A protein has these predicted regions:
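Bacterial N-terminal signal peptides
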Residues: 6-15
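Secretory-pathway glycoprotein ectodomains that are cysteine- and/or Ser/Thr/Pro-rich
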Residues: 17-73, 77-235
């Protein structure tokens, strides 16, 4: 996947989204933490919400719209089908301000840019992370470390061929890959820079998906980061 008009090869990254209890973020101790992700595709001059499992084509332009019921700092990293790891957000081309405010939508990229589908067919693996403190800040609590750069070693993800769900295709004519979208991630499959961050187990997260939005939630605030992945299926 390419960052339209800026990067030669930009891959989506997996990021963990989570509310941590700290003076710099809203406490969720009185309610469940909830993160809604809307995947949007550019259609001519407008953006349209699409099914998270939609199978995209080469050169399709995408972006995410994120809304949480908590405040924190958002980090997004991509493991592309070519094997490269790339930090998608924050960075100069996609927006340096990565603080998200409770109940306020944030676009990724936060600039006027977009992500362009490219590379071998398969699944882009996007990792999400929301921290109560800025990971590059000197004020980080002792148990947290600045987010290291993505691994330089190319590691081609398992080959997953995009497949249309026959029932959905017959019902509404859309090619939807039910293995795409948000899901938990095993600790041993995380890139090194994310594996070093103590996080809530994916088993403690709930994943819901609809035709135009996905929701990742936790029943209780745990005081730890949460890491999950969002798979983008394309031909």
């Amino acid at each position: 996947m390419r960052l339209c008009s800026v990067l030669a090869a930009l891959l989506l990254i997996s990021f963990s989204a989570h509310a941590l209890v700290s003076p710099q973020s809203q406490s969720l101790s009185h309610g469940a933490s909830r993160l809604e992700i809307v995947l949007e595709k550019k259609d001519k001059e407008s953006w349209q919400a699409v099914d998270p499992g939609k199978v995209f084509l080469q050169n399709d332009l995408l972006r995410f719209r994120v809304t949480a019921n908590f405040s924190g700092y958002l980090y997004v990293l991509n493991h592309g089908t070519s094997g490269d790891y790339t930090l998608l957000f924050p960075r100069a081309e996609t927006g340096q301000e990565n603080r998200i405010e409770a109940n306020r939508s944030t676009n990724v990229p936060a600039t006027e840019g977009s992500f362009r589908i490219s590379g071998p067919a398969g699944h882009e693996v996007v990792y999400w992370l929301v921290s109560p403190v800025e990971l590059s800040s000197e004020k980080i609590q002792s148990e947290y470390i600045p987010l290291p750069p993505p691994p330089k070693e190319r590691k081609t993800p398992p080959k997953l061929i995009p497949r249309c769900d026959d029932k959905i295709f017959r019902a509404r004519g859309d090619c939807i890959d039910m293995s795409a979208g948000p899901q938990g991630v095993a600790d041993d499959s995380l890139p090194d820079n994310l594996a070093a961050i103590p996080a809530v187990s994916s088993r403690e997260l709930l994943f819901e998906r609809g035709q135009s939005a996905s929701v990742v939630s936790a029943a209780e605030a745990s005081g730890k980061p949460v890491i999950f992945e969002f798979r983008i299926s394309h031909r």
